[in-house]
Amino acid sequence: MEFAGRLKKIRIRLIMIGICLIFLGGYSLIQEWKDQKKNTTKKVFDQYTDAFFKENISTNEITMHFFLENPEKYRLEQPKNLYPSMNQGSILNEKIKISKEIEKLKKFKQKELTKKQQNTYMVLMDYLRRQKNLSMYPYYERILGKTSGQQAQILLTLSEYRLKNEKDIKSYFQLLKGLDGYFDSLIEYSKEQVKRNLFLSDQSLKEVLQQIQNVIKQKENNMLVATFNLRIADIKGINAAQKKKYCRENKKLIGTKVLPAYEKLYSHLQALNGNGKNENGLYLSLIHISEPTR
């Protein structure tokens, strides 16, 4: 009887040990599954941010070339668009895209990310939410200005366009040819601002028109001629004769594409003179929108 009692105790002990082992084994499996899930989340998040970067950096040629010296390292193809677009379709698409990106980002659980990824998450979410708020006022942006306007800044960007080889030169020439299309989107945007009483004041427009007129007058001493000649001189692998040929082509494109694009922009903007209803700046318009009616 005493032996049977001991045997029973041993059985119970073994059963308890077995239960504990099963529990510990199950816990280990659950923990392993959780760890795998966290690792998967981290990997997917890295893939998401990588795709986000590639998509946004390659929306147009001039942006991608400005930020990336070797886009092929990121396996990026040549963008279809030469310049950013300011037309109604692109503005609406951007608004929809921002909302979708926020929803994608929300799917990630921050606690399953590394500290560095959590910081990236917070910065990206803050950026997207700010962009979403700004998208409520798509025509409040001041795209034209005497020095800071896009019609002035694009000259500086083109004059600093990085030239390392013949591929860069040909891409640069395509940008010169496509400047008219870019200005068309600025004209369309300006007309939409007029409809909403958000266009430049007459004084500001006068300054913009003066800046454009100065560009048009520089037919022989245009900055795009001088800067191109300097940049191409430093390129290795192109002989002197070919460089001279490219310099002639650049000067020709400025005369046949760039200056006519500025002349067209001048003409359309001049026709909008007198439509600047708000002399106090866009800030006042925002105040009127944000303040409750009393």
Describe each PLM feature range:
Residues F3-S290, R294:
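N-terminal maturation segment of proteins
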